[in-house]
Amino acid sequence: EAMRDKDKQQVFIRKVLIDACAAINRFKDVNRVAFVIDSHSWRYRFYQNYKYSLTKVKSPYYKDFNNLIEKVEKFLRNKGFIVSRVMGAEGDDLLYIWSIYFSQVLEEDLVIVTGDSDIRQIINPKVSLFCNNSKNLKFFCIPNREVEWNEYFPTDIMVNAVRPFEILLYKVIMGDTSDNIP
């Protein structure tokens, strides 16, 4: 019901924007901000049960949720933010493309702010990940940059060094239960 109530929709949109601002404000030297928005994944064509445990739960309000996301997207675009949304691509797909663009084309550092830590395999020497979806704020980077990031952040953010290849290898061997991949 909350997804259909106009007042609660406004509260939701405000919360999304305030949370985004709070996360961005943790970084002293932000040059650009880009947002990525999920689209219905191409993966469903190959595996019908992809994300089944998630989609069966959200299906009653999925259309209402998408309408809210479209309002957030429109607001962000009107304010001049970079917004990436590609039909058939999930947010993770777009984040991977952005990580390549920033690290290999522009040769700039990129911090991805997300609530989804299961994309840690895209981390590289120029790409790090800030997870702001819990009380325990987590930052993921390659081992060579752990000290640098620990000095950058206040102590309320836990900096974790990860080896992206090991994460990728684990997913290939064990599957990804969060996406219902055996």
Can you name each region flagged by the protein language model?
Residues E1-K79:
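Domain-level signal for Mg2+-assisted phosphodiester chemistry and nucleotide/NA-binding surfaces
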Residues V30, K56-P182:
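Extended two-metal-dependent nuclease catalytic cores across DNA- and RNA-processing enzymes
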